[in-house]
Amino acid sequence: DLVRSRGLGDVYKRQMKNLILIGMPGAGKSTVGVVLAKQQGYHFVDSDLVIQEQTGLLLHEIIEQQGDDGFRQVENRINADLAVKHSVIATGGSVIYGREAMQHLKKIGVVIYLKLSCESIAARLGDLRKRGITLREGQTLQQLYDERVPLYERYADITVDCENKSIREIVAEIVARLPK
């Protein structure tokens, strides 16, 4: 674990020192990201907004026009090209399907998985399509959750259990666990 921590610190210091938040929609990536960025004196980047700016379309419009696979290709390409420094990046929940995007994000910063139970996520979410959540026909949120969690865990440098914690507590835990 010490070797892993030391390696993480090297990446953090040598690279662009970004903090990348991954997790299910509704896990709090954008909310935590804004507070974390402010506290660390970092910029805040919402990759979903970058996608919307670069395509000129809302997420659900991309999904309607290009389908789920088309959306994921756009998401993968744009995240793989993100060139930011000293930023907290809140990613879209499906970013973990893009291998190029995740390899790039791991190269430019520390990947932090905001973990929350499926029940808590379901309670927070409204219209899934408007949130850019791509469920296949007949797929439940639980099935999507079960599909994505192993990917979040695989790519995470740090996993933060967000269950029953305030934004302030989550941010404090992230800061405490960052490489020194």
Regions found by a protein language model. Name each.
Residues 49-95, 99-106:
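ATP-dependent small-molecule kinase phosphotransfer cores
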Residues 107-150:
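A glycine- and Lys/Arg-enriched "phosphate-lid" helix/loop adjacent to the NTP-binding pocket
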Residues 1-13:
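Single conserved hydrophobic/aromatic residue that forms the stacking wall/gate
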Residues 21:
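Hydrophobic anchor at the beta1->P-loop junction of P-loop NTPases
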Residues 24:
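P-loop (Walker A) phosphate-binding loop of NTP-binding proteins
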Residues 30:
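Walker A/P-loop
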Residues 27:
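ATP-binding Walker
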Residues 35, 39, 149-180:
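NTP-dependent small-molecule kinase module
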